[in-house]
Amino acid sequence: MMQRDRWFRCRLSSYQTHRLPPPSEDSVPIATMERTPGLLECEHLNMHYVSEVRSIPSCAPFVVLQEWPMWWDMILSKWEKHVCKIYMRVCVCCATINVDFNQIVRGFERWTIHCHCIKPGSLQCKAGGVVLANWFKMMIYGSLYNLRFPWYREIVNCGMPKEVLFMGSVFVRGRHFIYIRLLYDGHAAIVLERMSFGWSFFSYGIMNNMVVLGCTYCKNLDELSVRCCARRTRRLLAKAVKVLGSFTVRSLMRSLVEPRRQGLLRGLMERYCPFTLADYNRGENPWRA
């Protein structure tokens, strides 16, 4: 039976303490469609659930995606990487959530965490589930970046099409992770082949194509640095839209549902106002070619 952590025993201070040094230039990964060494893709044949972690309202941008990818090598210390490599087998998208039961996002859903070890149910597997849940809590509280800077998404997504949009941010151990969703598989292949996002990785998830960018420029969390980071992210999205525009027949129009989505997310994070997935996805047809 997988373990459930109903309440956080302590609040992890993912903003100031236990900061990681900047990544070395020799080992910086770059998002590509090819298989990245050390990056384990999710395989449904051998996955099994090991724990659950309760969400908070600032995780709402990821709850609507119903999955939360993260390459753990980017946020773990050297010793934690050793433990993860030797005793655990964790994929890039080990946290999923199911909100289809009642179609309502309240901000306190439970994220289900799975692993791919060869001994499901063993003591080592259960212990790894507890460790993985504690690591995932850093991401849960790192999502408070979305509540502290709610205008970040407004700046980046202003006038952007639905095919390329910024979804949310996570701040863990002095590192800022920026989540960009590429709506279609073909668009993801075109963009990743023709441009570089720098320190990043690509997640071909169960339901989403996500490019996760790493940033250390805004590690002090001052408004000036964060606004510069937002403008840099917007320039990358604009470049991706330009690349897609040269390979698509129809023009990419700005997303009409994005302003309303921003209002729903801010209402949940700031005033605890729940919303339904029907309201969030209204007016968007994901199967349109």
Swiss-Prot record:
InterPro entries: Adenovirus_E4_30/34. One of its GO terms (cellular component) is host cell cytoplasm. Keywords: Early protein, Host cytoplasm, Host nucleus. It comes from the Viruses. Its main location: host cell. It is found in: Host nucleus; Host cytoplasm. The keyword ATP-binding does not apply. Plays a major role to prevent cellular inhibition of viral genome replication by nuclear bodies. Assembles an SCF-like E3 ubiquitin ligase complex based on the cellular proteins ELOB, ELOC, CUL5 and RBX1, in cooperation with viral E1B-55K. This viral RING-type ligase ubiquitinates cellular substrates prior to proteasomal degradation: p53/TP53, LIG4, MRE11-RAD50-NBS1 (MRN) complex, ITGA3, DAXX and BLM. Belongs to the adenoviridae E4 30 to 34 kDa protein family. Interacts with E1B-55k. This is Early E4 34 kDa protein. It comes from Human adenovirus F serotype 40 (HAdV-40).
